A protein has these predicted regions:
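Divalent cation-coordinating acidic motifs and surrounding scaffolds
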Residues: 2-287
Length: 287
């Protein structure tokens, strides 16, 4: 795809495969019976094949949002192995992004869009997070519309995978028609159109409600993703664990349940509850 084509309105139909360009509960389980009952329940909700997970975590690195990926950098060497230890079918991608003003020039993103495609190469993921650069952002909006478009269209999603984007951000997308110097002129990327493409490709987009901007909940609703109450940058690694394990292998989901039962942090309780609600919905719908 040519660079300038990213900002043009696309009318081609979307297919299922993207082109590749580049407080604690009252009682915790303490017996074999509890464990067997939980495993039986998970067999209904999480058959072995559902552990196939392609997940892209997209970090806004502008201004104060840099603290979120910064918190992950501090423990990434331990975090990444934990995410993979019980799921050989996990592929994880990471995007660190800024805004148009952070681009190297009108034809090169530079540090404005840094990414590693979904992979199970843990060393490369750790290296990417440690080497990713923070950005400044030039106005109240950020180029979320472009980030969504690029991740949806350029990620080599596996056909049988559960496809998820976790967007960790706090601002709003640029509107259609936005211009910034020569970097983008009369931008034709509409985030709602990109969300519809994601939904057609069965890509869920999870968002975090760091602010009360309504577009986050709308984005998640449009793509059948989760809008998760979350504010504290220092807990970002815990958020990533919850988002990954809630849709991972049976072992991952048991780990998620155990952490939820043991959790006493109010904010993380809300995160766990949000992801558990998806599990319950899936159970009710027999999906």
């Amino acid at each position: 795809m040519k660079f300038e084509d990213l900002f043009k309105k696309k009318t081609a139909p979307v297919t299922d495969t993207a082109d590749v360009t580049g407080e604690t509960p009252d009682e915790c389980p303490n017996s074999d019976t509890d464990t067997k009952q939980k495993e039986k329940s998970l067999d209904q909700v999480a058959p072995k094949s559902i552990g196939v997970l392609d997940m892209v975590i997209a970090f806004d690195t502008t201004g104060s949002m840099a603290a979120y990926i910064g918190a992950v950098r501090q423990e990434v060497s331990e975090l990444i192995p934990r995410l993979f230890e019980d799921n050989e079918d996990l592929r994880l991608g990471i995007v660190a992004f800024g805004d148009y003003c952070d681009m190297k020039n009108p034809q090169e993103f530079g540090k404005a869009y840094q990414c590693i495609m979904p992979t199970d190469n843990q060393d490369e993921l750790v290296k990417f997070v440690k080497r990713s650069k923070d950005t400044s952002g030039g106005d109240s909006d950020e180029f979320y519309e472009l980030v969504i478009k690029k991740i949806v269209e350029e990620t080599p999603w596996r056909e049988d995978a559960n496809r998820v984007i976790l967007l960790i951000s706090d601002a709003t997308p640029h509107p259609v028609g936005y211009t910034f110097k020569k970097y983008v002129v009369n931008n034709q990327i509409d985030w709602r159109e990109e969300a519809r493409k994601a939904a057609q490709m069965k890509i869920k987009i999870d968002t975090v409600t760091i602010t009360d901007e309504p577009w986050y909940k709308e984005l998640s609703q449009m793509t059948d993703g989760m809008s998760v109450p979350f504010e504290s940058g220092a807990k970002t690694a815990r958020l990533v664990e919850a988002a990954t394990w809630s849709r991972g292998s049976k072992a991952d989901r048991l780990k998620f349940d155990r952490l939820m039962e043991e959790c006493s942090d109010k904010e993380m309780q809300e995160v766990f509850t949000a992801y558990m609600s998806e599990r319950m919905k899936c159970d009710d719908d027999d999906c």
